[in-house]
Amino acid sequence: MTAQILDGKATAAAIKSDLTARVAALKEKGVTPGLGTILVGDDPGSQKYVAGKHRDCAQVGIASIQRELPATATQEEIEAAVRELNEDPACTGYIVQLPLPKGIDENRILELMDPDKDADGLHPMNLGRLVLNEPAPLPCTPNGVLTLLRRYGVEIKGAEVVVVGRGVTIGRPMPLLLTRRSENATVTQCHTGTRDLSSHLKRADIIVAAAGSAHLIRPEDVKPGAAVLDVGVSRSAEGKIVGDVHPGVAEVAGWISPNPGGVGPMTRAQLLVNVVEAAERSVG
């Protein structure tokens, strides 16, 4: 068996096509969605990631609002940039690119953001709304995983899902999304400290690997026909970026998301969705 590909690039392109029409409809009502970014310092990876987000914006007609600060920026200067975007009506959603320089209180920065403009869906208030099953911007990567599964008809309802990872961006919110009544999955959350991880994985219909541990998920751990989504990012001894899923898993799984090209494009697409939905809420 060779797994079918869960193609994040193609799915993201379809989402962008839909968003282009929604943005055009908003502009007819006098509203242009705007994505703001706050980038502190000159980390090449962060610069590349932010530039990609603004290229995505241009493709669908979303305005770009960029705030760049030097690596020497103080807590107060970064907080001032956050307040500026909170008050800017042209900005319907924004992100603070992480990580921030050492000595900066990241949680304080994130808490200052207007929850309604939280394009990443990771504001403490919005994560709380997710726990309470209240409407809120959803975390981009977990929502991207769900959207990808749905597009390819992978059965979520009643599925046994193992989420490997406990980070705030994926591991923590992913089970919250999967256990909503609209999804009705049964979730086991594992991590790098889980005893006998393999025994949990072998029962899973769906595996979401987000531990950041190279090739943690091995072919012998996977039930034949399972859907496996590789969200992890780490580096090999040679410095090459690798995922959490061993390449051999593709010969056992029924569905697999490539890394790169799987969940990554979906994360960026869901960011745009959050920005457009915020603009749509503003016009009722």
Curated annotation (Swiss-Prot):
SUPFAM superfamilies reported in the protein's UniProt record: Aminoacid dehydrogenase-like, N-terminal domain (SSF53223), NAD(P)-binding Rossmann-fold domains (SSF51735)
Coiled coil stretches, renumbered: none
UniProt-listed GO biological process terms: L-histidine biosynthetic process; methionine biosynthetic process; purine nucleotide biosynthetic process; tetrahydrofolate interconversion
EC number(s) on file: 1.5.1.5, 3.5.4.9
Catalyzed reactions per annotation: (6R)-5,10-methylene-5,6,7,8-tetrahydrofolate + NADP(+) = (6R)-5,10-methenyltetrahydrofolate + NADPH; (6R)-5,10-methenyltetrahydrofolate + H2O = (6R)-10-formyltetrahydrofolate + H(+)
Record carries keyword Oxidoreductase: yes
Domain of life the protein comes from: Bacteria
Disulfide bonds: none
Record: residues binding NADP(+): G165, R166, G167, T192, V233
GO molecular function, one term: methylenetetrahydrofolate dehydrogenase (NADP+) activity
Keyword terms of this UniProt record: Amino-acid biosynthesis, Histidine biosynthesis, Hydrolase, Methionine biosynthesis, Multifunctional enzyme, NADP, One-carbon metabolism, Oxidoreductase, Purine biosynthesis
Gene Ontology cellular component terms for the protein in this record: cytosol
Gene3D superfamilies linked to this entry: Leucine Dehydrogenase, chain A, domain 1 (3.40.50.10860), NAD(P)-binding Rossmann-like Domain (3.40.50.720)
Pathway, per record: One-carbon metabolism; tetrahydrofolate interconversion
Family: Belongs to the tetrahydrofolate dehydrogenase/cyclohydrolase family.
Protein task: Catalyzes the oxidation of 5,10-methylenetetrahydrofolate to 5,10-methenyltetrahydrofolate and then the hydrolysis of 5,10-methenyltetrahydrofolate to 10-formyltetrahydrofolate.
Quaternary structure, from the entry: Homodimer.
Protein name (record): Bifunctional protein FolD 2
Higher taxonomy: Bacteria, Bacillati, Actinomycetota, Actinomycetes, Kitasatosporales
Gene name in the database record: folD2
